[in-house]
């Protein structure tokens, strides 16, 4: 199995390039349709998108083994929340790839009796569950980092003898004893949390990249499952952005979120 995992890893770059091209075609097709391009040109773009999708399915054959190996490694993580989110995400990815393999067999003619609509819905359902777990993991890591950053800021303020912004020692408008002061205090706390979030994400590019990539990918299964119709333009744009970010993590491995 290890040999197969290494082999499938070598095809990741080609698969992600095909993915970027596929969603670029989806976006281009939407733009051409909006601008009244010739039906023949639109048909060619749709055919190219379909060929790229089928090619990606071929490149993903056996990726279930890679996902299962990743799940086996994640089981040994010491953090319970990370262990749960990452393991469940990889297991859903394995099921997604398995459904994708069945779809490839149906589209390529090897299994013509396959109900492609049913298997496509199954694959997107597992894909959606995987993305939800990924975003849950991102939210958990962000919360941990924000708590660490907040504690560090508090220690620095205590060391310098400064007060905590928006604390009980602040008087005047917005103080706890001032009528209507709770709303300004809430706004100040919210602003501080947003600034803290921005600082955390700016200081951790892999986490920022992972959040944006998963958020972009989320639109794809939501649209395909009919849970939130975004349209081919939004799906194409989000898929293209996500694919470019995935390619960046291959070119620059330090941008990949670990574990």
Swiss-Prot record:
Keyword annotations: Acetylation, Membrane, Peroxisome, Peroxisome biogenesis, Transmembrane, Transmembrane helix
Subcellular location: Peroxisome membrane
GO biological process assignments: peroxisome fission; peroxisome organization; signal transduction
Family, per entry: Belongs to the peroxin-11 family.
GO CC annotation: peroxisomal membrane
Residue numbers of N6-acetyllysine PTMs: 43
Membrane topology: Single-pass membrane protein
One Pfam family linked to the record: PEX11
Residue spans crossing the bilayer: 234-254
Subunit note: Homodimer. Heterodimer with PEX11G. Interacts with PEX19. Interacts with FIS1.
InterPro entries xrefs: PEX11
Transmembrane as UniProt keyword: yes
Region (Interaction with PEX19, PEX11G and FIS1 and peroxisome targeting): 211-259
Stretches assigned to coiled coil: none
Protein's recorded name: Peroxisomal membrane protein 11B
Physiological role: Involved in peroxisomal proliferation. May regulate peroxisome division by recruiting the dynamin-related GTPase DNM1L to the peroxisomal membrane. Promotes membrane protrusion and elongation on the peroxisomal surface.
Gene name of this polypeptide: PEX11B
């Amino acid at each position: 199995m290890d040999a197969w995992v290494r082999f499938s890893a070598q095809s990741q770059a080609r698969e992600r390039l095909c993915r970027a091209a596929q969603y670029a075609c989806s976006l281009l097709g939407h733009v051409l349709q909006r601008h009244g391009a010739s039906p023949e040109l639109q048909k060619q773009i749709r055919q190219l998108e379909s060929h790229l999708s089928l090619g990606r399915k071929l490149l993903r054959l056996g990726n279930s083994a890679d996902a299962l190996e990743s799940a086996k490694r994640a089981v040994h993580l010491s953090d319970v929340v990370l262990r749960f989110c990452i393991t469940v995400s990889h297991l859903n990815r394995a099921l997604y790839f398995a459904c994708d393999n069945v779809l490839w067999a149906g589209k390529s003619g090897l299994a013509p009796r396959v109900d492609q609509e049913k298997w496509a819905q199954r694959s997107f359902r597992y894909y959606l569950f995987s993305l939800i777990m990924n975003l849950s993991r991102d939210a958990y890591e962000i919360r941990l980092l924000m708590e660490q950053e907040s504690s560090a800021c508090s220690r620095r303020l205590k060391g310098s003898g400064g007060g905590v912004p928006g604390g009980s020692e602040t008087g005047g408008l917005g103080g706890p004893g001032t009528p209507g002061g709770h709303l300004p205090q809430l706004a100040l706390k919210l602003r501080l949390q947003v600034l803290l979030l921005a600082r955390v994400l700016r200081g951790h590019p892999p986490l920022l990249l992972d959040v944006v990539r998963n958020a972009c990918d989320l639109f794809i299964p939501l649209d395909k499952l009919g849970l939130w119709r975004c349209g081919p333009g939004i799906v194409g744009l989000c898929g293209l952005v996500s694919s470019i970010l995935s390619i960046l993590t291959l070119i620059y491995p330090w941008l990949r979120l670990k574990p």
